[in-house]
């Protein structure tokens, strides 16, 4: 199995549809916990915690639990994380946690992996 599994195609060619199909298959044929999320939602979730007046450890822990307590993390349109520096660091930590715990990561992008820094 490939981990992470990187899906690359130009916009409008079915990456999101493919990710939904993969996620639905995993949920239907196993007891694995699957989380499908767009990078925009990941960014919004993180920014709302950082900017919250209730910015405390328990909210950050809840955020991390949501994204790290899964068997399969599917994140669509990862290219949007490129300009979100603080969120990139949080995503990298989430990625590393999942990877080190042998959890599956599936990423989709309209940018080739060779174009990432």
PLM region descriptions:
Residues 2-20:
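Walker A/P-loop nucleotide-binding motif
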Residues 17-30:
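P-loop NTPase Walker A phosphate-binding motif
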Residues 27-30, 65-68, 72-73, 96-104:
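Conserved catalytic network of the ASCE P-loop NTPase/AAA+ motor domain
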Residues 31-70:
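Short glycine-rich substrate-engagement loop in P-loop NTPases that contacts/grips substrate
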Residues 36-37, 74-76, 104-110:
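Structural recognition of the conserved hydrophobic beta-strand(s) that form the central parallel beta-sheet
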Residues 43, 80-82, 114-116:
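Catalytic P-loop NTPase motifs of RecA-like helicase/translocase cores
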Residues 50-51, 113-117:
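Short regulatory helix/loop adjacent to the ATP-binding pocket of P-loop NTPases
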Residues 82-111:
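Conserved catalytic/switch belt of AAA+ P-loop NTPases
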């Amino acid at each position: 199995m490939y981990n992470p599994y990187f899906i690359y195609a130009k916009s409008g060619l079915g990456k999101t549809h493919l990710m939904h199909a993969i996620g639905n298959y995993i949920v239907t044929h196993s007891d694995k916990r699957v989380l499908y999320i767009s990078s925009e939602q990941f960014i919004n979730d993180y920014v709302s915690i950082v900017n919250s007046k209730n910015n405390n450890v328990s909210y950050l822990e809840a955020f991390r639990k949501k994204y790290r307590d899964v068997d399969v993390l599917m994140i669509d349109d990862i290219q949007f994380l490129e300009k979100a520096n603080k969120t990139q660091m949080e995503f990298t930590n989430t990625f590393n946690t999942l990877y080190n715990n042998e959890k599956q990561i599936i990423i989709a992008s309209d940018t080739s992996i060779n174009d990432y820094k």
